[in-house]
Amino acid sequence: YLILWEGGFIMDQRYQKLMDCYACFQKKISFVPQVALVLGSGLGDYANDIKVVAELDYKEIEGFPTSTVQGHEGKYIFGYVGTVPVVCMKGRVHYYEGYDISDVVLPIRLMKLMGAKVLFLTNASGGINTEFRAGDLMLIQDQISDFVPSPLIGANMEELGTRFPDMSEIYDKKLQQIIKKTAAVNDIPLEQGVYIQLTGPNFESPAEVRMCRILGADAVGMSTACEAVAANHMRMHICGISCIANMACGITPNPLTHKEVQEAADRVAPRFKKLVTKSIINIAKEIPLDE
């Protein structure tokens, strides 16, 4: 990870790559977001509700990882939700696509450098909690990320954060309260629970789902947790909503497909869009984002 530069300076390749991507962004876009939003599988249509001022395809950023998954278009959207300046990832990259974990979280780190203070994560997941049903929305209260490598492994990038970051409140409790209140006021049913990230791309076996339940997980997916680790390292305020696209293997007798995930996301889209939009507006009212 370390390379020697002229004059004897040592620079982390991962940090240099991040800064190269940031320099490329600065040449193309002058927009400064306050909130960063990541749209999960099948949820990309939310970007149509943003008052767009600019777009940047991932392929236009030299060295930037690009998504290969159906339902993940692969571009940054810059614009406004209400009057709140946001940057939206329309499509994310996943560890199972073969990228190094540092590349998987590079888009998150870049949004922090752009100016975003809040990270709003979304995903489509499998329900483990038997009280859940396909189409439910779950507020992520905590996570289990030990089944994928930590993006903090390797020499610490001191410019981004401390070597041993605290993880006692990854998902900001104040943001959780704002989202729960927003859901209640707008009559949007909202579950809450723990999200666990496994590597994918294969869906989980029934035995693995039983293991996840024993560990305390309510929903399982193939993204998000590693992104939250990287964002927490950079001291971002993090919140997350998981769309329960299907019940996990062993809970339902039916085989799981990616098409099912996308169809469930389509069904929940109106509630999802309303909750995300109103939550972002309320977050901006209650959290000082322009300081």
Where are these regions (language model features)?
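Non-catalytic positions within long, well-ordered alpha-helices that form the structural scaffold/packing
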Residues: 111-115, 213, 232
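His/Asp/Glu-rich mid-to-C-terminal helical/loop segments that flank catalytic regions of hydrolases
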Residues: 249-291
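Generic non-transmembrane alpha-helical segments
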Residues: 24, 28, 174, 178-188, ...
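Zn-dependent metallopeptidase/amidohydrolase metal-coordination segment
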Residues: 222-260
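Short, Lys/Arg-enriched N-terminal segments with co-localized hydrophobic residues
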Residues: 1-10
